[in-house]
């Protein structure tokens, strides 16, 4: 009860402990409690000790009369801890593989377009962005996207690239962070020479070597900052490609970020991806993951998703909640799962309301000189 907190804090001075983070007060009935716990557990000094988590109830009274409440609190904590650490592989294989890719990619990265140069030339030059994902709802949005492509900067997840190309839509940025080489299929036989390919430093080396017009970007992680290659960093790439698109749009200073194709759920026919997806509308990689039902777009019933997509959704909500002062996020998917901390608006309404000006045209930023690149490689 809030009254008990007030009574306790009026008799004991805990101001120093509260300010220093030794004590956190969390209201488990608050609407944003999941976001608050994610922020808490994602802090470095907290993250390191998550494996030691245990709920202690130090009063028999609460065990006797409030067992359901502390069980609920315990379940909330465990659920959000799992979201924070779900992507850790117990064998560390993924972590080692990503680090191996980074080391292999450093020569290519030094020859690519520095991320900081992109920011210096393009940041805060336009307000409206569209992030395109490859969910089942994308196909119905493509005609309108084509009509408005000159009035919004388009960030395209690699899996949606083929669908856009077939409609004659040229994205400004294409994002990729796959540590496997499956994504090579998304880029083969493409005519596009003007999009900027934004790649994570852990992207599979085969794809990094294959692509032109690329920027290989370091993650905002202390491990990568130790290389002192500051021209090529730093950004939160997240754990799925659309997350990378959103953080890139935020880094470039966009104020209105519209999302389409961001279903994060199966459609009524059981499709995982949009028509035209390179691996098929029913991608086999999604079939064997544990399923659950979540609230649908616009609150209209429920849709079927799986735990990986659900993790992505929660992490996006965390990202949007943390950046709601910097940008307005519009969910114009018109399908899939509801994503909190976004305004649900039809794509047509978004276009008519926001996309009234032509976007600026940019030359591709230049890479470092060979001399500068060689010096950095020697370091």
Question: Where do the language-model regions lie?
Answer:
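Hydrophobic, small-residue-rich alpha-helical packing segments that form membrane-like cores
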Residues: 113, 117, 141-143, 155, ...
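Short secondary-structure boundary/capping segments
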Residues: 12, 170-173, 214-215, 266, ...
